[in-house]
């Protein structure tokens, strides 16, 4: 193999790994640990999934109406089922991490550092893979 071909093959392999990992990311998005939403609701609202305490937040997980609507919730969160609230909470978690529940996120049972900014963690992993591919392609 020539001196040029070997680094090109390594770069192509690194690019393939990045592409494959990005393709699989949606397939394995739910493969990790799941939050204990009942524990978060217990902390947020005393476990009352129909909570409406007058503080501007509603439901067991204490959604603000704007957040609820932005992540696919319909109507008032306090009137939604536990399952509907959890579905919206999972979408909020994917984008905002546990920071969306600053007081009670720790009750989820998930490591806060891992779930604080999930998109940032994915970006960091991809950058590390790309950097490793670049370093591997540099002739020695």
Curated annotation (Swiss-Prot):
This is Resuscitation-promoting factor RpfC. GO terms for molecular function: hydrolase activity. The keyword Hydrolase applies. Disulfide bonds: none annotated. Gene3D superfamilies: 1.10.530.10. Residues 1-31 form the signal peptide. It is an enzyme of class 3 (hydrolase).
């Amino acid at each position: 193999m020539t001196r040029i071909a070997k680094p090109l093959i390594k770069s192509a392999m690194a690019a393939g790994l990045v592409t494959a990992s990005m393709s699989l990311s949606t397939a394995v998005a739910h493969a990790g640990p799941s939050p204990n939403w009942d524990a978060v609701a217990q902390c947020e609202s005393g476990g009352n999934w129909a909570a409406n305490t007058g503080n501007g937040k509603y439901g067991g997980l204490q959604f603000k109406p704007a957040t609820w609507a932005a992540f696919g919730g319909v109507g008032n969160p306090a009137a939604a089922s536990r399952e509907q609230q959890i579905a919206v909470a999972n979408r909020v978690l994917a984008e905002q991490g546990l920071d969306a529940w600053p007081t009670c996120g720790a009750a989820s049972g998930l490591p806060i550092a891992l779930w604080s900014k999930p998109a940032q963690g994915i970006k960091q992993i991809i950058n590390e893979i790309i950097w490793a591919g670049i370093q591997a392609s540099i002739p020695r």
